[in-house]
């Protein structure tokens, strides 16, 4: 019982004990003395000692995304950095293992300064990127520049070499050879079909002219035939028809009634027409 009474009396004193244990806050009256003033960076004579100026690095000001980045200043006599701007975190995610870094596109003949046209691009010392790495500098190389156009031209990457005139490496697809072979075969077959069609057409034009000449010769040698009901007589080309005898002559007025007709006499002697075999 007495312990419970003691705890009930000590509970209100806990805040006072905590305040006495905690250290003083930074915002209290105990402040650090001010730092001494830095000496000005004034360059004196050659014998005067130089003051060491140590400046703290201020945080870079925030730039809006619309403001272009300034060109890096390259000190003459020193090589530019091997990693161009925009590639610090690695090469861009692309399906091509190489990249082309273009320079300014303003000609020097127009009076423009190529180094100040596009401040976001790399200097003229940079060229094409390596096939398996980042861009490599080419300082003072005339072969990387065009004839006054301001474009950076260098050796073509291995992936862009022409197929027929360049080196054939392991990356050539064998299906390309199959496609070329099939295309050549199709062209040859089509040419043969066209030639055969023209030849048959020319032969068909010559045959009717020869057949017409043969028919004309046959018509000139064809004899005349007699189509009478009694019989058929073959007459020559210049043969004369047989003259009928008085017994076989039929009177002009027709057969008289009561007069017998001669036996074997044809009923129609005048119905003779030429027969032509077509």
From Swiss-Prot:
Extent of the signal sequence: 1-27
Localization: Membrane
Pfam families: AJAP1_PANP_C (PF15298)
Keywords: Glycoprotein, Membrane, Signal, Transmembrane, Transmembrane helix
Expressed in which tissues: Mainly expressed in brain and spinal cord. Weak expression also detected in heart, kidney, spleen and lymph node. Virtually no expression detected in liver and embryo relative to brain.
Region (Disordered): 25-93, 206-278
GO biological process, any: response to stress
Keyword Zinc: no
Function summary: Acts as a ligand for PILRA in neuronal tissues, where it may be involved in immune regulation.
Protein's UniProt name: PILR alpha-associated neural protein
Species of provenance: Mus musculus (Mouse)
